[in-house]
């Protein structure tokens, strides 16, 4: 596995949630799609967000593997929330565009997307997300790479 994907993937063993985690989680829980798919917020740090998506019939495609749309949505969310960690509480982000490269398909286990901020400007924020597959034994395998551009927008709730 490349060093890009060999970086730390959280195993859900973290201390009490921070104020930053709680702020991001409040927005994440409003995401109907993420709730429908069964995704969960795993880790939030300044400039970083990790989201998990367990395998289920809600996220598979006709051949039984994870659907590319589910992978893309997971990467979009991880990158978007990584960007949001760089903003004031009254702001959120909206995706302007993203490009994703699918590296391999997987069945079972769970996907983890780790979004990272590359540049946080006043008008645009550029992020990346690495998507990896975790099998039942905890082995990670590269799944997808995403690059994204986002725009800060006022929070509307």
Q: Where are the model-predicted features located?
A:
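Non-catalytic linker/capping segments at the edges of enzyme domains
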Residues: 1-52
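HotDog/MaoC-like acyl-thioester-processing domains
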Residues: 3-18, 87, 105-108, 112-114, ...
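Residue-level preference for beta-strand/loop junctions
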Residues: 33, 45-47, 92-94, 109, ...
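A conserved, well-ordered hydrophobic junction motif at loop->secondary-structure transitions
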Residues: 55-56, 60-74
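Feature marks short, surface-exposed loop/turn motifs that line or immediately flank catalytic pockets
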Residues: 59, 81, 152-154
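Active-site helix/loop of acyl-thioester processing domains in fatty-acid/polyketide metabolism
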Residues: 69-89
């Amino acid at each position: 596995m490349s060093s890009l994907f060999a970086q730390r993937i959280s195993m859900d063993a973290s201390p009490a949630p921070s104020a930053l985690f709680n702020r991001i989680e409040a927005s994440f829980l409003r995401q109907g799609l993420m709730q429908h798919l069964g995704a969960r917020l795993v880790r939030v740090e300044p400039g970083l967000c990790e989201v998990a998506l367990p395998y289920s019939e809600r996220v598979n495609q006709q051949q039984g593997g994870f659907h590319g749309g589910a992978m893309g949505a997971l990467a979009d969310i991880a990158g978007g929330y990584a960007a949001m960690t760089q903003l004031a509480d009254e702001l959120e982000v909206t995706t302007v565009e993203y490009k994703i490269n699918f590296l391999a398909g997987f069945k079972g286990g769970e996907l983890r997307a780790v979004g990272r901020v590359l540049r946080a400007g006043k008008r645009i924020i550029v992020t990346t997300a690495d998507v990896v597959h975790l099998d039942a034994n905890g082995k990670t395998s590269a799944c997808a790479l995403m690059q994204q551009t986002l725009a800060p927008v006022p929070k509307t709730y």
